[in-house]
Amino acid sequence: LNCPYVGNVIVGVSDEDEYFDTLEISHNPRVIKGKGGKERSDTVRLNLETVATEYVMVHDAARPLISQDDLKKLAVLTKDDVNGAILACKVSDTLKMVSDEKIIKTVPRENMYRAYTPQMFKTKLLKQALEHADKNHLAITDDASAMEVLGYEGLIVEGDSGNFKLTTPDDLKLAKLMIEKGNN
């Protein structure tokens, strides 16, 4: 919230949630309590109705270590009139295609990236893409995939690998260590 590249923050919260309102951040005038959907893409689609800016950045709470430098990398692209851009990191590990726990083949990694958030798009295009995905019951794992379905090209912006997704207890331990050492 102390970033010059971010305006208001809409937090998608389910109707059943009793925790968000107890957080200090929920009382910040720049934080707007939005609607929660069944799926992540539903939450984003529902809350885009309240966005009046030309561009929107979509982020998720599972990536709390986003840097201001990465936010700036996305924000400056709005001057170039791009459809959208996502933060990502080049894959450095060897990739294996697997079926029934058996290795099928090694997948070339030269053009592979791990998609991160935030992802930034022209608001009207993202609305259109998510409405299309919803109407056609498409499984959307990130906002860029909804844009791809309609043929909108987005840019890859090399992001900080410290902006990893917290999904396991080990991820949480690593994040705590990074915060303690000031690496966020």
Task: Locate predicted features.
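Short, well-ordered coil/turn elements that cap or connect secondary structure elements
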Residues: C3-P4, S26-N28, K79-D81, V149-G151
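A residue-level structural signature of the nucleotidyltransferase/glycosyltransferase Rossmann-like core
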Residues: R63, G84-I86, I104, P118, ...
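Conserved alpha/beta core of the MobA/IspD/sugar-nucleotide pyrophosphorylase nucleotidyltransferase superfamily
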Residues: T53, Y113-N184
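Glycine-rich beta-alpha junction loops
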Residues: D15, K90-D93, S161, D170
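Residues at the starts of beta-strands that form the adenosine-phosphate
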Residues: G7-V9, N83-G84, E153
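Short, flexible, basic/aromatic active-site loop/helix in glycosyltransferases
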Residues: K96-Q119
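Conserved N-terminal catalytic core of the sugar/cofactor nucleotidyltransferase
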Residues: L1-T53, D134-N136
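Conserved beta-loop-beta/alpha segment of the NTase-like Rossmann-fold superfamily
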Residues: R30, E39-D100
